Every structure is written in C-alpha cells, then in structure tokens.
C-alpha cells in the first residue's frame, strides 16, 4: 500500500503535548479515549511515551456506534496485555460509572500508602483525559461533571485550552486537546479516521475515502449495504457500485450522470449517522 504523508500537527496540539508533559506529575491516572469503531487507528502512537508509567485505562467511546461483538474482542485484547479497557458511551453515560470505579480500584494501594503516611482524608483522584480530536473528550467531561463546561462540537480540534474540572468529591479532571501524530505511515489508518469523521473532510479526497468505506462494507457488512441502498447484489467493480448507489439515491448531475462526490458524501454521512447500523472498522 502506498505511503500517505499528511502533515497534521496544529500549534495547539504541540502546546497540549508540552503542557500535558509538564502536568503529568500532578496526575494520578490517565483516561485514554479512543473511538470504539477504530480502537487502534484512533490511538496516538506517542501516547505511551507521553503517559510513561502512569496508570491508564483505555475508554472505547462511542461504543453505541460500534459492532458490539468486535468491541468485546478489543476489550479482551487489551485485557490480555494487562490493560484495563472499558466500552463507554459519553453521550448516554453507559460505562461511565464503571470507569470511575475501575480508576478507584487501580489507585487504591497508592491512596492507602498516602493515608499511612499521615494524609488525614483521601483527596480526589486527579485524572487526565487524552485522545485524538473528535473522540468525545469534551462530551465525556460534560457527562462526568453533569453540566456543559467543555465546548463540544463535531469539528476535529474544537477543544483548545486545558482546564481542571471537579467531578464531585472523588475526581478532578484535566481536559487536554487531542494529540495526533504529525503524519500517517499507513494509508488505511487515514481512511479509517476519515470514514468515522475523526479528521476533517478536507484532509483526504472524499471519493477515495468512500471507495475504502464501500469496499470494507462489501467485505464485512454486505447485507446492510444491500439493504440500505436497495441493491440486488454488490458489483465487484467499485465504479459500478458508485453508479448503482447514485442512481438508486438520485445523486445525479446535469444530464442524469451520477455525481460521485454526492455519492461519497451520502455514504459517509450514512456511516456516521448509523444508517448502516453499528460498524467497526478496526479488526483483530
């Protein structure tokens, strides 16, 4: 597969990395947020270096949008590596209580030692939530805090400044903008990030992204693809598949010619709004 180089390291991300590194000494535990649909592709390869030896829990967010069977496989995969991983949904709150409980258990011995050294009462756990843009960091913070504090949106990179937020008496959160590597070494990773909306639609050619997505759907979810677009069968030729979908859905330009840009936008919108059901693009 050809190497795809994309420069993607905005100034605010470089600043976030620097500030996170400076503040790690204040933090007890790290919540690493990933997209449950792409748990590996949405991880930052620098995260191990940045987090170093801090206790960590991987949160597979947007689990309500991911294939539940595949999500369970990923949770088991991380568990086999002695990494706690929890499937959550920051929108509905599924799994959120569990993440706090697991964090308390992971830090139990540390706090017991602090108490033994004379700390009169346990202080709040200090946690860092980190992840690439658009995996739901701000939504999770709002869910934990019970109010709208962090600015949220569907534009990657919307969270700009770090902030401490108290969540009851047990938890203090440092929200930090997502960190994404400066270039993708793997073309497929880029397409997965684009398909799920983790990177801006202006970064990659949308037709190329849709080609990737349709081929994936044809391989892993053919019945859903046929049902959604009323296809009798799925042609092997990708151009024919674009044509079939375009004609069925009226994605036409002047003269009745299929508008491939419109088809690409339709398919990606359908994926992102769950019109094709719960999908997982990273596979073990």
From Swiss-Prot:
GTP binds at residues 61-64, 134-139, 178. InterPro entries: G_CP_dom (IPR030378), GTP-bd (IPR006073), GTP-bd_ortho_bundle_sf (IPR023179), GTP-bd_ribosome_bgen (IPR019991), GTPase_MTG1 (IPR016478), P-loop_NTPase (IPR027417). It comes from the Bacteria. Residues 17-182 form the CP-type G domain. Keywords: Cytoplasm, GTP-binding, Hydrolase, Nucleotide-binding, Ribosome biogenesis, RNA-binding. NCBIfam families: GTPase_YlqF. This is Ribosome biogenesis GTPase A. It comes from Anoxybacillus flavithermus (strain DSM 21510 / WK1). The gene is rbgA.
